[in-house]
């Protein structure tokens, strides 16, 4: 189900953003589940304090856990002061209220769990023959502790990877 709207001449109001999130989140089957939301770090611009507050208001009453993983890419971990600014609420000892806020530790091999390999033949097909090697699929092992993952963030052109 697609939910949303946009304008060429103005931003969404906070009320419009809240209504869109309400409509999108109410259909998710997350009641009683553990939910991890992957959010961008401080290098991506978006109204994260607004969005964080709406996730807390709209999902926290329905779930047994609502936590956040900051997608750092290869950036440095964010301090609690930086995390507090990012989410618009105090983050103390890795928590904002009842929610945990985790930095993705891309620089620590123990962070990852291997989920498999995309075979070279499939990579070759996807890339039109430009690349033909196995690609390991490794994700933050934290995701294994949750029933539902949500990815939240803007999409921007990126000077290295095309889009981020």
Language-model features: where?
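N-terminal amphipathic/basic leader segments beginning at the initiator methionine
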Residues: 1-18
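Histidine-anchored nucleotide/phosphate-binding helix
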Residues: 45-66
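Hydrophobic alpha/beta core scaffold segments
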Residues: 15, 54-61, 147-148, 162-163
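An acidic, phosphate/nucleotide-engaging active-site surface
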Residues: 78-161
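Short glycine-rich or small-residue beta-strand-to-loop segments that form or flank ligand, phosphate
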Residues: 34-45, 67-73, 149-153
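Glycine-rich phosphate/diphosphate-binding loops that line cofactor/substrate pockets in enzymes
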Residues: 21-36, 62, 142-145
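Short alpha-helical segments and helix-capping/turn motifs at coil-helix boundaries
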Residues: 20-23, 50-55, 131-143
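Glycine/threonine-rich flexible loop motifs
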Residues: 48, 159-164
């Amino acid at each position: 189900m697609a939910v949303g709207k946009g304008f060429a001449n103005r931003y969404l109001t906070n009320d419009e953003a809240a209504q869109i999130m309400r409509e999108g989140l109410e259909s998710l089957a997350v009641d009683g589940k553990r939910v991890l939301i992957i959010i961008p770090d401080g290098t991506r611009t978006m109204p994260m304090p607004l969005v964080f507050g709406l996730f807390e208001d709209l999902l926290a009453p329905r779930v047994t856990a609502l936590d956040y993983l900051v997608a750092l890419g290869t950036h440095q971990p964010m301090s609690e002061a930086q995390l507090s600014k990012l989410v618009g609420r105090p983050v103390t000892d890795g928590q904002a209220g009842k929610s945990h806020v985790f930095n993705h530790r891309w620089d620590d091999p123990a962070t990852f769990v291997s989920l498999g390999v995309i075979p070279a033949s499939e990579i070759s097909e996807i890339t039109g023959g430009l690349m033909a090697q196995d690609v390991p699929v490794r994700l933050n092992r934290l995701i294994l502790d949750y029933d539902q993952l949500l990815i939240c963030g803007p999409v921007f052109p990126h000077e290295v990877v095309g889009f981020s």
